[in-house]
């Protein structure tokens, strides 16, 4: 049985990956640091400071697959006001992990990048559409270059043919275990929290609500990872992973309210800064090479997340 270690196992994506692979034919390990780990008899938890090379080396020893799901993340407020918090620790951490995985000759390394380096377009974006010489959205400048740097580290190590690397440029992920703290959450988590906790059937949305996002249910992301583990042949691949469909923030709010069976009035706070971008992913490469496609429609994913939220948070 292959040993898979999920770094950042107590985070949103990490926890979903742990639960997903614990039901598959893998020996699952997960790291945690400050955040207490959850109970699951099928997962072996290891305490690890991922900024400490010695601790990382110990955790990665004798593993077959490393999933880099650990990162310092937050929502639009921090991206605008404190963008530097996403750069330093993540750059150091990713450098330490990839070096350790290379030194220990771990067969497969999976890195979660994102899509903030992409430029807004009116068509679906392919992996090769990214232009390094084109100016990146100022709000994403630091975070985007941190991700690009980490992608290139993976590509660099892959050239030695010691191990295999998968880079995942995923869209906006949502689902159970997401961040629902209004100070730290992304658009989906923040919008759902406002609606489900509204006492006066009214919520406030930042800006005009016209910003559009490509949303993907977290189970579909987990399924992609499984297929990459089983089917990727080349030593380095970059994949777009998203729904390929855009929805505005205000229409997302309406969908969540409908699924929650709540009548909600939307108010728009034009004094709040928003990040204007339009990025819809072309995922034909993932489909062609791995046979991956979206299984969970947005309405289904919203409903599943609402049920989880009501059971675990409210």
Predicted regions and their residues:
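C-terminal substrate-binding subdomain of Rossmann-fold SDR/epimerase-dehydratase oxidoreductases
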Residues: 197-314
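N-terminal Rossmann-fold cofactor-binding loop
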Residues: 31-35, 50
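NAD(P)-dependent short-chain dehydrogenase/reductase
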Residues: 121-124, 128-130, 143, 155-230, ...
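NAD(P)H-binding glycine-rich loop region in Rossmannoid oxidoreductase-like domains
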Residues: 50-89
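N-terminal Rossmann NAD(P)H-binding glycine-rich loop of SDR-like oxidoreductase domains
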Residues: 4-24
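Rossmann-fold cofactor-recognition segment
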Residues: 42-52
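Active-site helix of classical SDR
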Residues: 142-149
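Conserved Rossmann-fold NAD(P)-dependent oxidoreductase catalytic core, especially the SDR/UDP-sugar
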Residues: 68, 95-140
């Amino acid at each position: 049985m292959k040993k898979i270690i999920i770094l950042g196992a107590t985070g949103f994506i990490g926890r979903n990956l742990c639960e997903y692979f614990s039901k598959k034919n893998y020996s699952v390990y997960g790291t945690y640091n400050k955040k207490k780990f959850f109970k699951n008899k099928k997962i072996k938890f290891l305490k690890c400071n991922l900024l400490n090379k010695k601790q990382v080396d110990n955790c990665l020893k004798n593993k077959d697959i490393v999933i880099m799901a650990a990162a310092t993340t937050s929502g639009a407020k921090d991206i605008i006001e404190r963008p530097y918090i996403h750069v330093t620790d993540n750059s150091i951490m990713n450098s330490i992990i990839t070096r350790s995985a290379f030194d220990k000759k771990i067969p497969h390394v999976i890195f979660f990048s994102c899509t903030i380096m992409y430029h807004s377009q009116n068509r679906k974006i392919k992996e090769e559409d990214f232009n390094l010489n084109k100016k990146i959205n100022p709000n994403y400048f630091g975070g985007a270059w941190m991700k690009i740097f980490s992608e290139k580290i993976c590509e660099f190590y892959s050239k030695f043919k010691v191990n295999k690397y998968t880079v995942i440029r995923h869209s906006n992920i949502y689902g159970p275990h997401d961040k629902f703290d209004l100070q730290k959450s992304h658009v989906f988590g923040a919008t759902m929290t406002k609606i489900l906790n509204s006492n006066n059937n009214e919520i406030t949305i930042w800006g005009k609500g016209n910003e559009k996002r490509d949303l993907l249910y977290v189970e579909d992301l987990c399924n992609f990872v499984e297929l990459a583990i089983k089917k990727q042949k080349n030593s380095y691949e970059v994949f777009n992973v998203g729904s390929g469909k855009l929805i505005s923030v205000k229409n997302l709010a309406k969908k969540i309210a409908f699924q929650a069976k709540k009548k909600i009035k939307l108010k728009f706070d034009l004094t709040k800064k928003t990040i204007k971008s339009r990025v819809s992913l072309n995922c034909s490469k993932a489909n062609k090479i791995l046979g991956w496609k979206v299984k969970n429609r947005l309405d289904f994913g919203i409903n599943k997340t609402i049920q989880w939220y009501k059971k675990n948070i409210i």
